[in-house]
Regions:
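Transmembrane catalytic cores of multi-pass membrane glycosyltransferases
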Residues: 39-41, 159-161, 258-266, 287-291, ...
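Membrane-interface transmembrane helices that cradle and orient dolichyl/undecaprenyl
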Residues: 271-288
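Hydrophobic/aromatic-rich transmembrane helices and adjacent perimembrane loops
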Residues: 108-112, 309, 473-502
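Internal/C-terminal transmembrane anchor helices
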Residues: 133-139, 348-361, 505-528
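Active-site lumenal/periplasmic loops and adjacent helix-entry segments of GT-C-fold
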Residues: 128-268, 479-484
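Start-transfer (signal-anchor) and selected internal transmembrane alpha helices
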Residues: 2-28, 44-46, 59-149, 351-352
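Membrane-interface helix-loop-helix junctions at transmembrane boundaries of multi-pass membrane enzymes
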Residues: 284, 333-346, 421-426, 432-461, ...
Length: 660
């Protein structure tokens, strides 16, 4: 073990080290943020101060020593055995999903253990036995297994938006071999997703569902290699493997691998931009490298509007980082500002101008809700700021979809509280290491254009994810940002982990890595975002896939129920979205008060899941909550059953427009 020389915290502060100032400032900020917990119960308000405080303390502890240390590693026999065991675990996952007809709690337990074995190889394999290719192969295979066992055991599709994109738009494009069916939709100007799936279906002569799985579903787990390639430019190979492994396991990333919509394809292109732009910023790049950045930028713009805006924020962070470094804002006492050639500045400024110009042009021509997409978004933003924005304006009956916070009169159960923290734990663990990595980069000799771009991009994206929603501004759809944000976070986190392992005492480093190895795969495997098809905690986490009987009922009910906007169907969320997006049937959220459907003349569609699962309904104030509603409660009063297939029942009031 190498000798460690303690450094004085006061001395480092007096020397003007920006990283130490940042760590102390982070600790103070965490303390100042604690009173917010008394004002709001939102999960991130409750947890972010703790994460920031712990990260700051870890960095200060590690900064007190200068020389490297070595940690305990696996024996050669164990290092060679773990890859085989992880492959056995993946085979068990396939077998379980096949024989049990879906992903169960046992499945998720084995998935978590498999993730632990992969992560243990990253952290504890000796340099002589460490094989990046072998571990990355396991990461990609595990990603494929997790995603395809979900997709192949779920009838139809998983999620909400996918029903519109596939059942309506892609199907119509496939049949007509033209974009005319979406000429009045916003995706007419961003059709790459629909063209990819329709083109794959035509090329391979298969259905559009199979084409979606064979194209985008395969690309999603493979795209994590962009994170590895990006991180390898900045830090050692071991920590690059860590970045890709952690990113692949995050529930938000798994979500877009099973809920396959334009966001998914936009994420693939964003990861390609992350790698290609980092390469341009970090190396003596050639013209082809910059052309790749432009190519993937155009691809994102032609795929998805939100993804394009996120890409614009990321590239803008690169320009902002360049200005900050060129003006010597880090620590002018230690050295001169970093030098940038005029070509670097012109190229990055030109890229921003090109992306912004193309986005503005495309959005100005994109039809959306009777106007253009650009004008509509600005109108939404202006309306939000003028009417509902305010500090801690976090929730309301119309603030989001069916997963909105329950009203105050309903409260939350213990399991709902557990799930609330379980869903964010994986992201917060990664954020902890990201904060450490950001502080490490703030030290002048560790800063480069590429690494500082990652820090600036992460901070900017966190503002859109947490900052604006804190004031009630949700126009930028913050829920879509997490998988994109996790990519630069994973890169910066890799630098943070490498720093901690090098500078903490071996015992402390091993304890920290062991805790992460056990906790991170467990919480990410059980998180709601990555288990939309079959949640492990079925009575608390909402299922966003459907049984054969539930899907059959939507078609039959659409055939027998007249399309009447004045007398829509009423059912739970998310089941209502299938009627709307797949069948074009007028539908509203079911209102339930005191255990019964509240309005006597509503046509109710009840499914068994409303009693046994975690479906959302509304109360009379418009808040979403998850009561257990039996068929007798839903079809109470004067309603008669007009359709039933054993799992789904439709009941209407005698004399109403309600089928036959």
């Amino acid at each position: 073990m190498s000798h460690k020389t303690p450094n004085s915290l006061v001395g480092m502060l007096k020397s003007g080290r920006l990283d130490i100032i940042g760590a102390v400032g982070g600790l103070l900020a965490a303390l100042l943020m604690l009173p917010l917990q008394l004002l709001a119960s939102q999960v991130y308000i409750q947890t972010l101060p703790l994460v920031l405080g712990v990260a700051s303390i870890l960095y200060l502890l590690a900064s007190r020593t200068d020389s490297a240390s070595t940690i305990a590693t696996l024996t050669p026999q164990a290092a060679r055995l773990l890859p085989s065991l992880s492959v056995v675990g993946m085979a068990a996952l396939v077998g379980l999903a096949t024989f049990q007809g879906g992903r169960t709690l046992l499945y998720y337990d084995i998935a978590a253990m498999t993730g632990m074995m992969v992560m243990a190889q990253v952290f504890f394999t000796d340099d002589g036995e460490f094989s990046p290719a072998l571990i990355l192969t396991q990461v990609v295979l595990l990603g494929l297994v997790v995603r395809f066992t979900a997709l192949m055991t779920s009838p139809g599709y998983i999620g909400i938006d996918v029903w519109t994109h596939m059942s309506n738009w892609t199907a119509a494009i496939y049949q007509t071999q033209s974009l005319q069916p979406i000429a009045d939709m916003k995706y007419f100007a961003s059709p790459l997703y629909h063209l990819l799936v329709a083109g794959a279906a035509l090329l391979f002569d298969i259905g559009i569902r199979e084409a979606l799985f064979l194209s985008l579903a395969i690309a999603m787990p493979i795209s994590v290699l962009f994170v590895y390639s990006t991180t390898k430019l900045l830090v050692g190979v071991r920590w690059a493997v860590f970045a890709s492994t952690a990113y692949a396991l995050i529930g938000h990333v798994v979500e877009w691998g099973i809920h396959l919509i334009p966001t998914s394809l936009g994420l693939v292109f964003f990861l390609a931009i992350l790698y290609s732009l980092t390469r341009v910023l970090h190396l003596d790049y050639k013209l082809r490298d910059f052309v790749l950045v432009v190519f993937f930028s155009v691809a994102v713009i032609l795929t998805h509007q939100i993804s394009a805006f996120i890409m614009l924020v990321f590239t803008g962070a690169g320009l902002l980082a360049q200005f900050a470094l060129s003006f010597g804002l880090f620590n002018p006492r230690m050295s001169s500002a970093l030098d940038f050639s005029p070509q670097d500045t012109v190229n990055l400024s030109g890229l921003i101008a090109f992306d912004l110009g193309l986005i503005t042009f495309m959005w100005s021509l994109t039809p959306y809700q009777g106007g253009t997409f650009l004008a509509t978004i600005f109108s939404y933003l202006e309306n939000t700021i003028s009417s509902s924005a305010g500090f801690l304006a976090l929730a309301g009956p119309d603030g989001s979809t069916g997963s909105a916070a329950a009203g105050p009169q309903h409260g939350t159960t213990l399991m709902q509280e557990v799930v609330k923290y379980l869903d964010v734990a994986g992201f917060l663990l990664l954020l902890l290491f990201t904060i450490v990595g950001s502080m490490y980069i703030l030290r002048r000799e560790n800063a480069s254009h590429a690494t500082f771009t990652g820090v600036v991009a992460t901070v900017a994206m966190l503002v859109f994810v947490f900052g604006f929603p804190l004031f009630g501004i949700r126009t930028f759809v913050p829920g879509r940002w997490f998988a994109f944000l996790a990519a630069p976070m994973a890169v910066i986190a890799a630098l943070g982990v490498a720093f901690l392992v090098k500078n903490l005492t071996p015992r402390t480093a091993v304890v920290l890595l062991l805790l992460f190895t056990v906790a991170f795969p467990t919480v990410t495997a059980l998180a709601s975002h990555g288990t939309l098809d079959s949640p492990p905690l079925a009575d608390t986490q909402t299922r966003y896939s459907y049984t054969d009987a539930e899907l059959a009922a939507t078609g039959t009910i659409a055939d027998i129920q007249p399309d009447n906007e004045e007398a829509p169907l009423h059912t739970d969320h998310p089941y209502q979205t299938v009627f709307d997006r797949r069948e074009g049937q007028p539908v509203k959220a079911m209102t339930v008060t005191n255990g019964t459907a509240s309005t006597a003349n509503e046509t109710i569609v009840h499914r068994t899941y409303q009693q046994k699962g975690a479906a959302y309904v509304r109360d009379t104030a418009g808040f979403a909550y998850q009561p257990s509603v039996s068929q007798q409660q839903a079809c109470s009063g004067t309603r008669d059953v007009t359709y039933s297939n054993g799992d789904v029942t439709m009941c209407t009031t005698v004399g109403s427009d309600g089928g036959s």
